[in-house]
């Protein structure tokens, strides 16, 4: 690619991959010279009202591993990846003026669906020439038999309409890297400095716990390896429905969620690989149930898009008049010191690894809200701080459910935690693993 072609910015938010990446594909197809950009917004690094930084150490390490992996792949094609932190508009302006001496640069970006992210999108759209893509969704919003504002309130109705009326698109056409050569024009010294700001390797100051259920390594390379292993090498996908409520070990669940949250794995790729597996190996309830869970993820994105800021309000999607509080009980909960063994074991796993099973999440959330009487938003914020697979739509959507202010037709999800422990940890093995 010759040096006279104009620069363009590919601003990746949570699509940290080369496969099924319409932003990069379109940029190169339209014969721009891409600079791939990732920005950690200021709020992710600042202490929130509950005393936590949204981007906690586990999440940050997983993010950095993912960016290092992506940068390595991009460099093989002669493309730079820049990592910045701070105000999004300021950082985009800095890169734009460094590349073109003006702000009139083309930007390709993936859309987000939570309120604050969409607020940023509106500001960016007002300041720059942006082409947006729904790279994080399984479905194309234009194909839905309902508008976003008319998204069904109940998941079963949403799922029914998707399965009946929507055809999932094929993956984005592969990027034609042959159009690219090593970029002849070096980036400015300023931008080269930003390129170096990304660690060359993962942060080793946060040791991994050998009790962890799965050795998560960030990045598209690890994500594709996990997908291939879970489906094709081991065929564990064929028993997913029976094992998904497990607590110990790497293969009781898919472990795809962390890779989906950063976009190291495309939801469309998961869907089409499952369909291919069903055609070539076997189709059963378990293979369908993986798609079922991907549809839950999709549902929460449309719900967040539909309801905006209400997803984060005390009264949630139902706008309930509620009085919420936090006190020393919340501190005991997040430290894993409530005295309830099953709750404490799950919280200790989260604190040590950044991961918790789906069964564990439901129980600890219910216990915080219904047994300890604490503000559900504090629990959601702590999950945001710790979870490798955090995304605002699924996280806050699920907390709305548990707190009884969300889409659940029932009043709330109060779990009998002791009964759950007897059912899912009958021998106490999981609790023992995470006992002090």
Indicate residue ranges for each PLM-predicted region.
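Active-site-proximal binding-pocket segments
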Residues: 249-436
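Trp/Phe/Arg-rich N-terminal binding region typifying the photolyase-homology
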Residues: 1-170, 348-349, 394, 398
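Short secondary-structure transition/capping segments
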Residues: 82-94, 128-133, 177-192, 405-412
């Amino acid at each position: 690619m010759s040096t006279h072609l104009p620069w363009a910015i590919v601003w990746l938010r949570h699509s940290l991959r080369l496969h099924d990446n319409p932003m990069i594909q379109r940029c190169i197809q339209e014969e721009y010279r891409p600079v791939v950009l990732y920005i950690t917004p200021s709020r992710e690094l600042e202490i929130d009202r509950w005393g936590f930084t949204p981007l906690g150490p586990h999440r940050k390490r997983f993010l950095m591993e993912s960016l290092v992996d992506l940068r390595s792949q991009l460099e093989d094609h002669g493309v730079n990846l820049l990592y910045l932190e701070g105000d999004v508009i300021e950082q985009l302006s800095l890169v734009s003026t460094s590349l073109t001496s003006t702000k009139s640069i083309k930007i390709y970006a993936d859309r987000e669906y939570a309120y604050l992210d969409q607020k940023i999108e509106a500001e960016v759209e007002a300041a720059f020439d942006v082409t947006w893509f729904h790279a994080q969704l399984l479905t194309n919003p234009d194909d839905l038999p309902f508008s976003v504002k008319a998204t069904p309130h109940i998941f079963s109705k949403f799922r029914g309409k998707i399965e009946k009326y929507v055809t999932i698109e094929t993956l984005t056409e592969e990027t034609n890297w042959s159009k690219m050569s090593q970029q002849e024009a070096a980036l400015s010294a300023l931008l080269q400095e930003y390129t170096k700001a990304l660690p060359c390797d993962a942060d080793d100051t946060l040791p991994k716990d050998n009790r962890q259920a799965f050795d998560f390594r960030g990045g598209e390379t690890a994500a594709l390896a996990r997908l291939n292993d879970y489906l094709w090498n081991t065929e564990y996908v064929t028993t997913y429905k029976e094992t998904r409520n497990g607590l110990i070990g790497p293969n009781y669940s898919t472990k795809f969620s962390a890779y989906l949250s950063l976009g190291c794995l495309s939801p469309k790729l998961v869907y089409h690989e499952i369909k291919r597996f069903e055609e070539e190996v076997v189709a059963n309830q378990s293979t369908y149930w993986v798609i079922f869970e991907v549809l839950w993820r999709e549902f929460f994105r449309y719900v967040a898009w539909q309801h905006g800021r209400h997803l984060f309000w005390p009264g949630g999607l139902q706008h309930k008049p509620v009085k919420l509080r936090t006190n020393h009980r919340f501190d005991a909960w997040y430290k894993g010191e409530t005295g309830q063994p099953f709750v404490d074991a799950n919280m200790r796993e989260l604190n040590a690894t950044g991961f918790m099973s789906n069964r564990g999440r439901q129980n600890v959330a219910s216990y915080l809200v219904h047994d300890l009487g604490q503000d559900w938003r504090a629990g959601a914020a702590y999950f945001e701080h710790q979870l490798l697979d955090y995304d605002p739509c699924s996280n806050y959507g699920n907390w709305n459910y548990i707190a009884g202010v969300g889409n659940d037709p029932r009043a709330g999800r109060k779990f009998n935690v002791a009964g759950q422990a007897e059912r899912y940890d009958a021998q106490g093995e999981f609790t023992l693993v995470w006992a002090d």
